[in-house]
Amino acid sequence: MKPTTWNYEPQRPAFSRALMALGNTRKEIVVASADLSSSVGTHAFSQEFPERHYNFGIAEQNMISTCAGIASTGKVVFASSFAIFCTGRVYDQIRQSVCYPKLNVKIVATHAGITVGGDGATHQMIEDLALMRALPNMTVVVPADAPETEKAILAAADYEGPVYIRIGRANVPVCTTGKDCQDFEIGKATVMRDGDDVTLVGTGIMVAKCLEAAEELAKHQVSARVINLSTIKPLDERILIKAARETGCIVTAEEHSVVMGMGAAVALVLVENAHVPMKRVGIPDSFGESGEPDDLMAKYGLTVDNIVDGAHDVIKRRGR
């Protein structure tokens, strides 16, 4: 599907639909929230299955610890809150109570990144991927759009061990409807568009911007491969190494700090396996601020033009 024909949808209703599907078919599914059921997408589940939903109020640390206890009895628990609250505030509980015993707690973090807009720096979680991918036994997933969010939730329910799923607040382009995107598997990246001159690696809402950038580059006779890196940990190293060797240069794009985010994870793979020019498009080492989402994306360098410029830069450095 071309960028000009994309529909825009929020990801949280997709999370809600997936929870309802799981609730109707699997009695071991339990959901927890922290005073934000309507905002994060767990409200419908709480109404349909009140005996399997727990609202902990503004007590995220208690939520995660209790979810670990519930999971230790054989349940599969989905815990959800804003990304700022269910990562940094509860890091000790995630590490000690969830990851160390490798329990089936799935943390769905909403309102991630700077696209929460006016909520400002205190609510703009831009370092969560760095925190979560550092934890042993933690799997990290960042869906590109609503359809992929639904698939990711369903896949997480079947995946053994802790899973962190990051989604945003804003409406995002529905870009994963092509035939190559029908099958979703945790740990597997998807080639969204083939190309020979440069590889654009996107995650989350930046996948759509990578596809738009590829369209712009094509106008200048630059053939860009686009990879949707929906799983940040474990990385699909094979597809990244193959792309690096075949195109000779890579640009990564993420709505996250460049410090230890997806781009850093990709760089670690390349430095050991395929030395090619690389450019990371992401949020500089700084906090966010209040503003309209599009204005913030422009200020922090997360636009289609930034990706296009990055592509021209790595192609020039590659020297062919």
Task: For each feature predicted by the language model, list its residue ranges.
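Thiamine diphosphate
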Residues: 1-166, 171, 183, ...
